[in-house]
Structures are given as structure tokens and as C-alpha cells.
């Protein structure tokens, strides 16, 4: 069997091109086709003159074939202003161009309350099944929100629930536009910050100590109890016990190194292991083990590296660097430093956020900001808003880009199976009978669409069309109305730019 597979793989180059010709004879005349790199699509219809006064959706449906996305994606709807923006993005930038199988989950606060938050768990489980989720910003209720919506309980953060189920790392990265000034002007390249999304302060147990007494920490283990003296209180105070686990730290290391390698950027881990010698030291040791075992050779081949640094040293380096690296942070450090980076690069509204599993297979993408409540209050009253939708648009593009990668892996297996079937049909008796019904397209074209949508956003801003938050960065807090667009006008401007880009040759 092994020899059969080896022989089939050796002949895969010839057989793949033969299969393409079998499926589509017109491909024979095309020189130098790329093997396993997408398929060729029908020629787009192009008009020599523009069609005026036509809706973008109508125009694109007539002019451009929709890209078929072969496998499902999970969509998690959200709350308030971002929910309104989410619908505009889908209606104007996504559904007119893509044929999607969407597994929809409403994570709006009222539906979470109605389902006792089960919908959040179900959406995370669906993400594990389908490998890609795209999430709208959601409300994490506090006491005020509980009263506002009449909630049954103060439900946990949906992001926290999803992170714990996916057990991954949150990576945030700025979206750069040449005309948007940066508070840290030396940051010429993005900095991708990875936040370990498990344990530490976010799963800690804390307590108020009401009076004098000894605080001890104990664990019941098979070899006998372990007991540690923590502090001898002389009066009232506070105490905290927190933890992490090797499995999650290792997954954090794997996903961080996978992200750095994908970007071909160096990777830095920051801890305070000089103080927390065992706790933070465990992070340092596991990262080094994973690097030595799996990644060192690959990193060195591409002239990138992994390095551990103390958190205070790393913060100082970050401020004076020009960017272009991945920064792996523990949970609390990542929470704080990601907002610092966002502001340093200009705006939290220009920050992507993806949650990547340890094996790199499952990804959840979202905007790094909240639900923009202040704008939503104006929106409810029918007043004009100018809300930045770029991070939400990039949530879609980053999720779709990952969907393409997953499809491509599946496609490689499909192509190999097809090649084997031609020489050894007895291995896959049903394969040849199903060949004419197989649809293996969408890979490179989906990636091209994602890249063009991102480019459309950036070029729209760089052309001077932007929302108020970005206009303030350029013109100051008293910016006049002529310098910015409202929420829907900006999305329309991006859609117009995207329409033009989709008529041009592929970027990939």
C-alpha cells in the first residue's frame, strides 16, 4: 500500500494536469498552470462605461461571478452599533460577492439571556467543528446592563467563554494607513501582540482577609498533600490564588510560533520570571522546549528568531522599535499592552483581533473594540453617526482568509486522492464516478477577494474618505463635517472601491 501511494504521488504532477484537462478541456491551452493553487474561473464581465445610479449590489451581481466558499463558516452576531454595522457589511461587502454556507448564531444580549447563554457555548462548539468563526462585538453585562435589559443573570463575557472552549491565543494587529498619524511615530511596521487567553488573573480566586491569621495554599495530590505558607496577616488585607496549566501554555507557544512563522517575523515572549521564578519560569521553559523541538530550524531558515525578554525590558524595546514582530504576552499583560499598542498606532477602531487555536487549525476573528454604545444611542434616535467599520470588515477578511487556507489543505488531499484514483481505481471505487460533480474551486479567488477588500478599506481612507474618529487624528478634535463620512457613506465608499478592484487582475 505504501509503495502504491509513493508511486501515485510521484506521478501526481502529470496526473493533476491531466485531471484538469479532463474536467475542462479549455485549460489545455493555458501555459504553466499552478498545481494545487486554485483553479481558473470564468472570465469576469467588464463594462467599458460605468452604469450610473445603480445599486452596488445589483451591479456586482450582474458583472462579477460570486466566489463559492466550499466549507461553512460560523457567524456570531452581536450588539448595539456594531450589530447595525455588521448587517451593512454583510449586505454591501460580503453576500453580493460570496456564495457562503453560514452557520448563524445570535450572540446579542437578549438571545444569550433567552437561552441561558447556551447559544455562546453552541457557537464555540460549532467553531471547533467548522474551524472558522467571524464574530461581531458583544455586550458583557454589568449591574447597569442587567437592569437595562432585565436580564436573568449577569452573564459571563462571551469572548471569555469562547476563549476557554477554543483554548487559543488572541492575536491583535494594527491596520496601517499612510495618512493616519501615529502617537508613536517610529512604528513603521505592525506589531502583532499575542495574548494567552487562559488562566492567571482571569480565572483566579480572590478574597478579602478580614483580620489577622495565616494564609496557606494546599493541594491534594496522589503522593500526599502539598502545603505552602503564603503570608502571616497582622490585620485586614486581600489575597489571590491563580493558576495555569502546561497544556494551555504549550498551545500558547505553538500558536505564537505558528503566527510568527506565517508572518516571517521574529517572536518575543515577555514574562517576569526573575520575580515569579516558578510560575513565569514555567512559561519560559515550555516556550523554549517547543521552539527547540519544532520550530528552531524553520525559523533559522527564514532568518527569524525566538527570544524571551523581561516584561519591563520588552515594553521599553517596543516603544523604541520600528515594529515588525510578534509579541507573546501572558493573559493580563496582553490585555493591557494590546490597548497601548492600539492607541500608539492611532485607533482601537483600526485593530484586528483573531483567536487562534494551538494547532493553528481553528480561528475566530472579530474587531478589537466594543459595541460603540454612545453611537448606538444616537442611532436609536435616528441621528447621524460616523462609526468606524474597518475592524469589523477585517474580521470578515481574516476569517475568510483562514477559510481559504483550510479549504486548500482539504483540496490537496482531494487532488492526491483523484490522482491515485486514475492509476489505482480499486483504492477509491466511488471516486471516478463522482469526478464530474466535484467542485474544487474558490481557494485562490477567495484569498484574492479578501486581499482586495482589505486594500479597498485602506485606500478609501488614504484617499481622504474616512469616519470621524480618523478625521480627528488628522484635523484635530474640532474637525468640520466636510472632512468625514457617516457610517453608511463610508461603507458605500469601500464598496465602490471594492467593485473597481474586483474588475482588475488577481492579487495572488
Regions found by a protein language model. Name each.
Residues 110-226, 238, 332-336:
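N-terminal glycine-rich phosphate/adenylate-binding segment common to multiple enzyme folds
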Residues 47, 51-64, 508:
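N-terminal mitochondrial targeting presequences
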Residues 1-44:
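N-terminal chloroplast transit peptides
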Residues 197-199, 203-253, 260, 266, ...:
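Glycine-rich phosphate/pyrophosphate-binding loop and the adjoining helix
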Residues 69-88, 216-311:
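Glycine-rich phosphate/diphosphate-binding loop of Rossmann-like nucleotide-binding domains
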Amino acid at each position: 500500500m505504501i509503495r502504491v501511494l509513493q508511486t501515485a504521488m510521484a506521478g501526481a504532477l502529470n496526473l493533476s494536469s491531466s485531471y484538469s484537462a479532463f474536467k475542462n478541456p479549455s485549460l489545455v491551452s493555458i501555459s504553466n498552470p499552478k498545481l494545487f493553487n486554485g483553479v481558473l474561473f470564468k472570465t469576469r464581465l467588464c463594462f467599458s462605461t460605468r452604469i450610473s445610479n445603480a445599486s452596488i449590489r445589483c451591479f456586482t451581481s450582474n458583472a462579477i461571478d460570486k466566489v463559492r466558499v466550499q466549507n461553512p463558516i460560523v457567524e456570531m452576531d452581536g450588539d448595539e452599533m456594531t450589530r447595525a454595522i455588521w448587517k451593512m457589511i454583510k449586505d454591501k461587502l460580503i453576500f453580493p460577492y460570496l456564495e457562503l454556507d453560514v452557520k448563524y448564531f445570535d450572540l446579542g444580549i437578549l438571545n444569550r439571556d433567552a437561552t441561558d447563554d447556551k447559544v455562546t457555548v453552541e457557537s464555540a462548539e460549532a467553531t471547533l467543528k467548522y474551524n472558522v468563526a467571524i464574530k461581531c462585538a458583544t455586550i458583557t453585562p454589568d449591574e447597569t446592563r442587567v437592569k437595562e435589559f432585565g436580564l436573568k443573570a449577569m452573564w459571563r463575557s462571551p469572548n471569555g467563554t469562547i476563549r476557554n472552549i477554543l483554548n487559543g491565543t488572541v492575536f491583535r494587529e494594527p491596520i496601517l494607513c499612510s495618512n493616519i498619524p501615529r502617537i508613536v511615530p517610529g512604528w513603521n511596521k505592525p506589531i502583532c501582540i499575542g495574548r494567552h487567553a487562559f488562566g492567571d488573573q482571569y480565572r483566579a480566586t480572590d478574597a478579602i482577609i478580614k483580620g489577622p491569621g495565616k494564609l496557606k495554599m494546599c493541594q491534594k495530590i496522589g503522593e500526599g498533600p502539598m502545603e505552602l505558607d503564603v503570608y502571616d496577616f497582622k490585620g485586614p488585607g486581600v489575597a489571590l490564588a491563580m493558576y495555569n496549566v502546561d497544556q494551555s501554555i504549550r498551545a500558547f507557544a505553538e500558536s505564537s510560533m505558528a503566527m510568527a512563522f506565517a508572518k516571517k517575523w521574529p517572536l518575543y515572549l515577555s514574562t517576569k520570571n526573575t520575580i515569579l521564578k516558578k510560575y513565569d519560569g514555567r512559561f519560559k521553559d515550555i516556550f523554549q522546549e517547543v521552539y527547540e523541538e519544532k520550530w528552531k530550524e524553520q525559523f533559522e531558515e527564514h532568518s527569524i528568531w525566538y527570544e524571551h525578554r523581561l516584561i519591563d525590558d520588552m515594553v521599553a524595546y517596543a516603544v523604541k522599535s520600528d515594529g515588525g514582530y510578534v509579541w507573546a504576552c501572558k493573559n493580563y499583560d496582553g490585555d493591557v499592552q494590546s490597548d497601548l499598542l492600539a492607541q500608539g498606532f492611532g485607533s482601537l477602531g483600526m485593530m484586528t483581533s483573531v483567536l487562534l487555536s494551538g494547532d493553528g487549525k481553528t480561528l475566530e476573528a472579530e474587531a478589537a473594540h466594543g459595541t460603540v454604545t454612545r453611537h448606538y444611542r444616537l442611532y436609536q434616535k435616528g441621528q447621524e453617526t460616523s462609526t468606524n467599520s474597518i475592524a469589523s470588515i477585517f474580521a470578515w477578511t481574516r476569517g475568510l482568509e483562514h477559510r481559504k487556507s483550510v479549504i486548500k489543505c482539504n483540496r490537496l488531499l482531494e487532488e492526491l486522492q483523484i490522482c491515485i484514483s486514475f492509476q489505482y481505481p480499486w483504492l477509491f471505487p466511488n471516486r471516478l464516478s463522482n469526478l464530474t460533480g466535484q467542485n474544487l474551486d474558490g481557494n485562490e479567488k477567495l484569498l484574492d477577494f479578501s486581499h482586495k477588500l482589505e486594500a479597498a478599506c485602506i485606500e478609501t481612507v488614504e484617499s481622504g474618505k474616512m469616519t470621524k474618529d480618523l478625521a480627528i487624528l488628522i484635523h484635530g478634535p474640532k474637525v468640520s463635517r466636510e472632512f468625514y463620512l457617516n457610517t453608511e457613506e463610508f461603507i458605500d465608499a469601500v464598496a465602490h472601491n471594492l467593485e473597481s478592484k474586483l474588475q482588475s487582475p488577481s492579487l495572488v
